[in-house]
Swiss-Prot record:
Residues 56-300 form the ABC transporter domain. It is a multi-pass membrane protein. Residues 373-621 form the ABC transmembrane type-2 domain. It is found in: Membrane. GO terms for molecular function: ABC-type transporter activity; ATP binding; ATP hydrolysis activity; ATPase-coupled transmembrane transporter activity. This is ABC transporter G family member 8. The gene is abcG8. It comes from the Eukaryota. The chain crosses the membrane at residues 376-396, 409-429, 447-467, 485-505, 515-535, 543-563, 600-620. It comes from Dictyostelium discoideum (Social amoeba).
Amino acid sequence: MELETIEYNKSFNICENGDSKGVQLTFKNISYKVENKNYNKNKKEKNKNKIDPEFVNLDNKTENSNEKEITILYNVGGVIEKGELVALMGPSGSGKSTLLDILAQRKSTGKITGQLLVNGKEIGEAYKKYCSYVTQEDVLLQTYTVFETLKFYADLKLPGVSEIEKIKRVEKVIEDVGLTLKRDSRVGGVLAGGVAVTGLSGGEKRRVSIGCGLITNPSLIFLDEPTSGLDSVAALQIMKTLLNLTLKGVTVICSIHQPRPEIFQLINKVMVIIKGKMIYSGSNILEYFESLGYPCPNNTNPADFCLDSAVEIGEGERYTEICNQWENKWENQLTNEIEYPSLNVDIPKTTSWVYQYWILLNREWRGFIRNKGNALSRVITAIVIGALFGSCFAGLKESDADVQKIMGTLFFLTTGLMLSPFSMITLFLSGRQLFNSERASKIYHSFPYFLSMITVELTIEFFVTLVEVTVCYMLARLRMDAGRFFFAVLVYSFIHSLSTFFISSLANLTGTSDLTFSYASSLSVVFMLFAGFYVPTNELPRAFGWLHWVNPAFYGYSSVVINQFEDLQLKCTDEPCKFTNGNQVIEYYGIEDWTRGGSFGVLVAWATFFYSLSYFALHFLHREKR
């Protein structure tokens, strides 16, 4: 067979004529096993009750099996040619999504055996470079437009490509997925906090997800249930879009449940899996089922008929016989398969962390600015809280009579800034799904992502803190000389940031808002109780005296107290005078052994600790498991 000569642009693995260079994908004897988590439990029950294990159906193991491992796929094989639209079909739990994940090299758990060949050769590191995977859920940034979303992927997945070429590629993909009229429309959805952004329909979002996978012009694209959750019209549009891609040489492989007749007619090849075994792969499935004694009645959806017949075969006595017959037939067909030349292109390098950080930082800032409700509410809240604190303690004097009020002002300002990041719990967790999806696609590293998110958050928090502290300090008439005021702003900014890292680390460790709020609120009560305001540190019971040493709030609070009272002369309003100068106040509260710089240094160390904990929890925990 004579192949068309297509010149490659090696810089980012697309053909000069805009079409993808096709490949042949062959998989042989693919088996997949997972650990049976109930094995030990079943073993104990077996020994206890003396149950005969012969009742177990070894062809359809479940979690109640007495085997150490559960086999999900059994020696599955097949050939997928260039430019085919292939549908993996089967009832729920048959193994079609598992096979799709294995072919896309996205399976991160279990034990996989068998061979996966591209153009007759074992796959290597380059395999994922010319494959794309589209998940069942459309995980997209709600405030970005269609163009911005695809441009984001182009920036991170096409290293070494000029800006002009990236834009051309994005415009081409937008045209390919039929979203030219929606180019500048926002994706839309519900933001953290419940704010709804008007945007695309479900079918249009699915096409954006497909477009993200097409940015690198892949030779293979895998889709998990691309029509799931869509109405019949949107589902048909999606499948027509995929069919158009196959005409350009892209091989499309998708799992699909029960397509309507119009969709079924678009499919080039159907692979049917029942109970982990392949019973058919080809383009004449109705004829094959008829040869097995299952003719398709008139006026019946062929897809429904095929699925019903497959289920009946799986539950019948001929299941093993039919599976073995198909396996032998497929092995004979394999000897006559067409050999394509191997794909021999340079593997594009990934973008640098610095570049990833810059692109992600740009996206974070746009996301914040476009979420106007969140931005405005945070500024207004800072002004209101600062005004409330300042008004309650307005016009304080540098006298011994107002020492307690000054201490209260400093304490409640500290605790207010520590508690304000609680509102960010949903924000941290809402971005987690998007991060996991993008990380699984390997478009950026977790460190640039985390750093960009924290950079934006800290910048916003510094501004909010500056507003709140300025309003409060001016109304309460606390020390406003430049050095001490800006040091107070710096300390309060780190208190705010430390609390953000603390909440972020708990959110990344627990993965749920309920647990995060429960742990954070409990620990915050402990932090406030032993911060040194309610009970001076030198008056704490011995059993609890050590707690203030491991309390970040203590170091932040002591810093601003020392900053306020150090070398301050106090006026005596009544006799006897309890405090004549601020140093006596510092001594009374048991922090005379600390300096404002020393306390601030420990506060910075705590902030660094929670920053590191938050990052490592994000990087190593709650990864996408397939």
